[in-house]
């Protein structure tokens, strides 16, 4: 199986039902924010693509995170907790961007307002915990615990 095939949303071999539901939930949320941000650019008062781009990046991480550590034999609960932290931070980032969009009524406020700072912080935390998961999976792959196709 190629790297592209393993990252498709439909490839859910070895995942639990909860992981599948979470993947589809975050995928639907990602599509919704993309459509809303593009629609808001054409029909809104202000261009919010920067803000929604941040939320979309965090959601893109969250789409592939559920079940990420399941393929690692003997994975600790800490890795599963890292998955949940990434998912929670992406939700916080998305919520902060939406709150910032609603509270300024479509008019761009100062560049670094509170919702933007919260969204950036949550996105940074999500990225850091994703890197922890990525390193754990690569270390397991180098030890020979995970086949290269996963």
Short names for language-model regions:
Residues 1-32:
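Cytosolic juxtamembrane helix and N-cap/initiation of the first transmembrane helix
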Residues 23-30, 57-60, 83, 87-90, ...:
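Residues within membrane-spanning alpha-helices of integral membrane proteins
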Residues 42-53, 94-120:
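Interfacial non-cytosolic loop connecting adjacent transmembrane helices
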């Amino acid at each position: 199986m190629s790297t592209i095939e393993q990252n498709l949303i439909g490839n859910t071999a070895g995942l639990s039902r909860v992981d599948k539901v979470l993947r589809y939930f975050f995928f639907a949320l990602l599509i919704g924010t993309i459509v809303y941000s593009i629609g808001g650019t054409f029909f809104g008062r202000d261009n919010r693509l920067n803000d929604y781009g941040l939320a979309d990046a965090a959601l893109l991480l969250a789409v592939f995170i559920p079940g990420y550590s399941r393929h690692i034999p003997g994975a600790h609960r800490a890795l599963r907790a890292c998955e949940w932290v990434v998912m929670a931070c992406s939700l916080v980032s998305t919520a902060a961007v939406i709150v910032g969009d609603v509270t300024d009524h479509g008019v761009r406020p100062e560049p670094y307002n509170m919702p933007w700072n919260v969204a950036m912080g949550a996105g940074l935390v999500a990225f850091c915990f994703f890197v922890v998961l990525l390193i754990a999976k690569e270390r397991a792959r180098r030890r020979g615990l995970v086949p290269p196709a996963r």
